[in-house]
Amino acid sequence: MHVKQGDTVKILTGKDKGKIGEITKIIKGSNQVVVQDINVKKKHVKPRKEGEIGKILQFEAPIHSSNVMVYNAESQVASRVNYQKDESGKKIRVFKKLLNTN
């Protein structure tokens, strides 16, 4: 998957298009991500026991990973990610849009 937990991402499609948030959870089986304060849904819960009251719960629903793009806050640009090796041979992630700006 092209995104990791903790990445800052920009939403590309849907009702939250253009918003920026941080990934809090990744669901690998369905290639979905949960982004903080994005795609917030409400669930109405009926009371289960005697004397308990009903509730309206708010939660962040998952979004498909193809609908988000990694966002660079420093240059304020969303870009795809390229992988390169540094001098020690460790893989690092580099923004493709920032590679051609030398």
UniProtKB/Swiss-Prot annotation:
InterPro entries documented for this protein: KOW (IPR005824), Rib_uL2_dom2 (IPR014722), Ribosomal_uL24 (IPR003256), Ribosomal_uL24_CS (IPR005825), Ribosomal_uL24_KOW (IPR041988), Translation_prot_SH3-like_sf (IPR008991)
Chief site of localization: plastid
Family annotation (Pfam families): KOW, ribosomal_L24
Subcellular location: Plastid, Chloroplast
Gene Ontology CC terms: chloroplast; ribonucleoprotein complex; ribosome
UniProt-recorded Gene Ontology molecular function terms: rRNA binding; structural constituent of ribosome
Keyword set includes Ribonucleoprotein: yes
Keyword set, alphabetical order: Chloroplast, Plastid, Ribonucleoprotein, Ribosomal protein, RNA-binding, rRNA-binding
Presence of keyword Methyltransferase: no
Gene Ontology biological process: translation
Family recorded in the similarity comment: Belongs to the universal ribosomal protein uL24 family.
Protein function: One of two assembly initiator proteins, it binds directly to the 5'-end of the 23S rRNA, where it nucleates assembly of the 50S subunit.
Matches recorded under PANTHER family: MITOCHONDRIAL RIBOSOMAL PROTEIN L24
NCBIfam families in the cross-refs: rplX_bact
SUBUNIT field: Part of the 50S ribosomal subunit.
Name used for this protein in its record: Large ribosomal subunit protein uL24c
